[in-house]
């Protein structure tokens, strides 16, 4: 089973994506901070890391800088960025962060799962970027995900 590390501070987004990937047979570890992500990577092998672009690290860096750090420290691992801010392939290339692709939020889970499958099975040197228009929402293939999204939104409102 392939292990995916998901680094996202938004609990609802992380829960939705992690659940969809687990249903498809991936082992998913969720980290809320760059520090937690580094600890996971030190402890076990990870095939792919997905980092929220808006992540803020302890030193004030963002998801791009964490992606650069991970690409240098773990060259065999693929790194993807995710965000509700849309980035073009050209913007990602200019950022020179070494990522293999970009997953826009909100997630089209069917597309994301297929893309992750492609990236996990591709050699690390495969640098074809994927950058799609923001997804159309929750895939009917994952009906339990809508429940997660609703429950998470309710929890957020109560805080």
Where are the predicted features?
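As written
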Residues: 66, 94-102
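CheY-like receiver
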Residues: 122-159
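Short amphipathic alpha-helix used as the core "switch/output" element in two-component signaling
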Residues: 39, 61-76
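Active-site residues of response regulator receiver
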Residues: 52-54
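Two-component/phosphorelay signaling modules centered on CheY-like receiver
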Residues: 11-29
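C-terminal output helix
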Residues: 107-117, 124, 128
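Acidic, metal-coordinating helix/loop segments flanking the phosphotransfer/catalytic sites
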Residues: 5, 30-48
